[in-house]
UniProtKB/Swiss-Prot annotation:
CDD domains: CysN_ATPS, CysN_NodQ_II, CysN_NoDQ_III. Residues 113-116 are annotated as: G3. This is Sulfate adenylyltransferase subunit 1. The keyword ATP-binding applies. InterPro entries: CysN_GTP-bd, CysN_II, CysN_NoDQ_III, G_TR_CS, GTP-eEF1A_C, P-loop_NTPase, Small_GTP-bd, SO4_adenylTrfase_lsu. Residues 168-171 are annotated as: G4. Residues 92-96 are annotated as: G2. Residues 25-239 form the tr-type G domain.
Amino acid sequence: MNTILAQQIANEGGVEAWMMAQQHKSLLRFLTCGSVDDGKSTLIGRLLHDTLQIYEDQLSSLHNDSKRHGTQGEKLDLALLVDGLQAEREQGITIDVAYRYFSTEKRKFIIADTPGHEQYTRNMATGASTCDLAILLIDARKGVLDQTRRHSFISTLLGIKHLVVAINKMDLVDYREETFARIREDYLTFAEQLPGDLDIRFVPLSALEGDNVAAQSANMRWHSGPTLLEVLETVDIQRAVDRQPMRFPVQYVNRPNLDFRGYAGTLASGSVKVGERIKVLPSGVESSVARIVTFDGDKEEACAGEAITLVLNDDIDISRGDLLLAANETLAPARHAAIDVVWMAEQPLAPGQSYDVKLAGKKTRARIEAIRYQIDINNLTQRDVESLPLNGIGLVEMTFDEPLALDIYQQNPVTGGLIFIDRLSNVTVGAGMVRELDERGATPPVEYSAFELELNALVRRHFPHWDARDLLGDKHGAA
């Protein structure tokens, strides 16, 4: 067992008390990103090493791996703690998104180590989609690079408001303050073009030597700010979803027997209470909450992020992909939207193409109507293009086959974020964030017979895995 972990358990008075203390710690999800060879994996390895999160057998294995695959001579290659793929170790790069967990006395952390190579930018976007904070690594010898700008823009596009600019490899520039100051000024000049109200902090460090990572550096006494670990432990993360109206996308209809019907999913935003009136979209039917069922038993109230099963007082038609919200909330389903897109496929995105799109639990089809512009990540300017290439970022106009209950992504990432799926290969080819909703161009009303509506309801109720379209929802949306 890790000696520091054993000591923590002893201090808490046993395993159960220690586990209870862990549950009450706040959780910070963050990612490391930046250009190639800026030291992202080494930084994570250093954090794990200096917070004593490495077990003895892992340390022994690291010594052996450093001799075979290491790039640091006789020193431990801490990057090997994170780079687990054989191709990563052979090339000395990160390809996949690697997740690691560690905790200190103040906080729990989940780290996403993302690749720096441009061809793996799509992997970086995947890692950023669930994070609250981004650590942007900059090589002190190279300064701000294109990939630094790209990752900064993607992070803010995906709703990350806290950026820690870690200027790494200060040991290779003799820990000069003027180098740090110059890079800081260059990045702040670039950051003026980034969207949103951002919290940007700067830390000069050396991941290889451990300077300013978990302990203050004796080599940079000119830096009076906190270490990287102190920033991570103290940054105040205000989740926007806690303040947003209630949104509950239905992931699964739970019917284990004839006496129970519940609607399972994760509460995307807001809160819900027993007895609260709710509305189902796209049908618009209302009911009230009878029970809130969780793994630990029934609750009177649930908050954003909790996995729950809602039991309603009325037996109404609800299927996977439907959205539950407060009855007094107004959210008109839309068929047209402007979407910020990060394209992840070799084949470019072009107007006229159709894709399956998935939003929370809802899956439907969409057509690309137009590409307004592509972002030039060097200067964040907009330019006209006929198609969006691999790793391209742009604003796209889309039309959905059926009305969807959508939010603006910056307000609610769950109900405002979607993925593009190739209809032939079933491969995820892009990520989208709703920028604007457009209710113009509604489909003319469609009249369905009573038999068609009843058959559709039966199919959606008893065969939800077929993902049958809600004809009643279409009718309301078209009207």
